Regions:
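N-terminal secretory signal peptides that target proteins for export/translocation
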Residues: 1-15
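Intrinsic disorder/low-complexity segments in short proteins, especially the signal peptide
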Residues: 10-12, 28-31
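Intrinsically disordered and other compositionally biased segments
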Residues: 12, 25, 98-101
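Bacterial N-terminal signal peptides
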Residues: 16-28
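Gly/Ser/Thr/Pro-rich low-complexity, intrinsically disordered segments
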Residues: 32-412
Length: 412
């Protein structure tokens, strides 16, 4: 396709290559199971856990086959009462930028975090060969660290009290200058022509920007510092100012990067003290895990309606088309990871978002949202990929959500 199309997601404008489901690119070569077991018999009620489901402590998995699609649906059901099961996000290559398969991201989870027992692909991301390939579209918090700021969209997270949420999250992140002026900022993303972005060492070796001014920040005083956490204020001193972009990200320094068209920072000099706020709406104090996604499908136990698209662009029409899908849902007792295979007429044709929402509600979810789908849709359980990715193998993706088992004295 020639030229460049832009999709407008909230307050951000993203090129057509941004949506991982839009193009059949980046196909991995890892092995996948075409005939994952156990399989729920078609005579059982839709969404009901079969007697032969794979049982692990606190977790069950099954593959439900339905002739009426046909559909092949993979479900992981997690007991929320288990103190030894934790959710965690991953990123490719342990940096914001770059892509790797779900299996590779699982291998990169540190042993200290626990043993991964299940995982699913995560947010939409930059898929093309740009300097920011792999950048997640929305919010991501990894072990308490903000690695990507909200993109004015839906996210899933676990609050400090252990309660799951799936709802819209807005960025309220700012930098306050010595003269009192305040500017909105984003974290670890491509800088727009009038944007200000805060880059952390988690991005990669350098900011990859072109032009503008970049302010090297170091800790000032005894307040909080890296890793960057949500719902906090950081006091920083300007140690250096670099022209031209692509500043190195070294040690525990931050880089505040201003595009050439940004006005109002001319009085910021070496030695100036600025304040960085990582506020969001809703606020996320103490959150250890968060990941962005797509539409809310079930809210308060009610199926959400999806309007007929006013545009023929893929972003809009894909909502009403059948594609491979990935989703997360929950109720008072369980969290569900669901993957629906698609684009394989003899196995599974995929689902619309409404069909997926109906299925999630049938599982008992009172809240449910979808993740990136299409060729990205991948579910991993107990050491292997259990679904049949539509491209014939694992696609390299930007991030993922994993379930880890941690050491505990609990013996349930």
């Amino acid at each position: 396709m020639s030229g460049r199309l832009d999709f407008n997601f909230g307050s951000r404008v993203y090129p057509s290559w941004f949506v991982g489901t839009a193009l059949g690119l980046l196909v991995g070569v890892a092995g996948c199971s075409k005939e994952a077991t156990p399989i729920a018999p078609s005579s059982s009620p839709l969404g009901q856990e079969p007697a032969q489901a794979l049982k692990l402590p606190g977790l069950s998995y099954w593959n439900e086959r339905r002739a009426e699609g046909p559909w092949s649906i993979h479900v992981v059901k997690i007991d929320r009462s288990r103190q030894d099961l934790r959710l965690r996000t991953t990123i490719a290559r342990n940096t914001v930028l770059g892509l790797s398969s779900l299996s590779q991201q699982i291998r990169n989870v540190p042993a200290s975090a626990g043993k991964v027992v299940a995982a699913i692909n995560g947010d939409f991301y930059v898929v093309d060969q740009s300097p920011y390939q792999g950048d997640p579209r929305g919010l991501q918090i990894l072990a308490g660290e903000v690695v990507s700021s909200p993109g004015d969209q839906v996210a899933f997270w676990i609050d400090a009290a252990g309660e799951p949420h799936a709802e819209h999250v807005d960025s309220k992140m700012t930098v306050a200058l010595p003269d009192g002026a305040t500017f909105s900022i984003r974290v670890n993303e491509e800088r727009g022509p009038r944007g200000i972005v805060l880059y952390t060492p988690r991005l990669g070796p350098s900011t990859r920007t072109v032009g503008g001014k970049e302010y090297v920040l170091d800790r000032e005083g005894s307040g909080p510092w890296l890793p960057l956490e949500p719902a906090k204020t950081y006091t920083a001193k300007v140690m250096d100012i670099r022209e031209g972009g692509n500043a190195s990200l070294k040690g525990d320094h931050l880089i505040l990067s201003a595009a050439p068209r940004v006005a109002g920072l001319n009085d910021v000099a070496v030695g100036s003290v600025v304040k960085i706020s990582t506020a969001t709406a809703p606020d996320l104090p103490g959150v250890q895990v968060a990941i962005g996604g797509g539409n809310i499908m079930v809210r308060g136990g009610k199926l959400q309606e999806f309007q007929m698209p006013s545009s023929g662009a893929y972003k809009y029409r894909s909502v009403l088309e059948r594609h491979p899908r990935s989703a997360i849902g929950f109720n008072a007792t369980h969290i569900f990871l669901v993957e629906v295979d698609g684009r394989q007429p003899d196995l599974s044709i995929g689902m619309t978002l409404r069909e997926l929402g109906q299925y999630m509600r049938g599982l008992g979810c009172v809240e449910a949202m979808n993740f990136d789908g299409g060729g990205s849709s991948t579910l991993w359980v107990d050491g292997r990929v259990v679904n049949s990715p539509s491209n014939g193998g694992e696609r390299d993706i930007g991030n993922a959500l994993v379930i880890v088992r941690t050491p505990t004295t609990e013996t349930k």
